[in-house]
């Protein structure tokens, strides 16, 4: 019983010393870490999606971003992208009616300008 208490006490003391050493080491490395983060490109942390709301009048570029296709995509690719996105965002399955309307508007805009 006494040896267990001593072992636990030594373990706690060792953890305390290790934590103190780690904090001191981090203080010395702080300028280097800041320099590394400043040298990274700003887009590294921006995420992989378009940040911004919808434009008042939908453009071809915005429609392509919504559907995830090229602005010059053919009708088959536009239909496939529309179907895939609507399966995920359909209002009958808990999706937003506003988002569904924007997806449909994007499909209509791109299909009107796409080649067969």
Swiss-Prot record:
The keyword Kinase does not apply. The keyword Ribosomal protein does not apply. The chain crosses the membrane at residues 4-24. PROSITE patterns: DNAJ_2. The modification Phosphoserine is found at residues 39, 70. The modification N-acetylalanine is found at residue 2. Residues 62-116 form the J domain. Keywords: Acetylation, Chaperone, Membrane, Mitochondrion, Mitochondrion inner membrane, Phosphoprotein, Protein transport, Translocation, Transmembrane, Transmembrane helix, Transport. GO terms for cellular component: inner mitochondrial membrane protein complex; matrix side of mitochondrial inner membrane; PAM complex, Tim23 associated import motor. Residues 2-3 are mitochondrial intermembrane. Gene3D superfamilies: DnaJ domain. Residues 25-116 are mitochondrial matrix. SUPFAM superfamilies: Chaperone J-domain. One of its GO terms (biological process) is visual perception. Belongs to the TIM14 family. Interacts with PHB2; the interaction associates DNAJC19 with the prohibitin complex. Interacts with TIMM16/PAM16. May be a component of the PAM complex at least composed of a mitochondrial HSP70 protein, GRPEL1 or GRPEL2, TIMM44, TIMM16/PAM16 and TIMM14/DNAJC19. Mitochondrial co-chaperone which forms a complex with prohibitins to regulate cardiolipin remodeling. May be a component of the PAM complex, a complex required for the translocation of transit peptide-containing proteins from the inner membrane into the mitochondrial matrix in an ATP-dependent manner. May act as a co-chaperone that stimulate the ATP-dependent activity. This is Mitochondrial import inner membrane translocase subunit TIM14.
């Amino acid at each position: 019983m006494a040896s267990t208490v001593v072992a636990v006490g030594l373990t706690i003391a060792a953890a305390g010393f290790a934590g103190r050493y780690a904090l001191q080491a981090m203080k010395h490395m702080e300028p280097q870490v800041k320099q590394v983060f400043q040298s990274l490109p700003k887009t590294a942390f921006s995420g992989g999606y378009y940040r911004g709301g919808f434009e008042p009048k939908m453009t071809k570029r915005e429609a392509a971003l919504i559907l995830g296709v090229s602005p010059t995509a053919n009708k088959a690719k536009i239909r496939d992208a529309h179907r895939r996105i609507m399966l995920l965002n359909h209002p009958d399955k808990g999706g937003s009616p506003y988002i569904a309307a924007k997806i449909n508007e994007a499909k209509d805009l791109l299909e009107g300008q796409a080649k067969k």
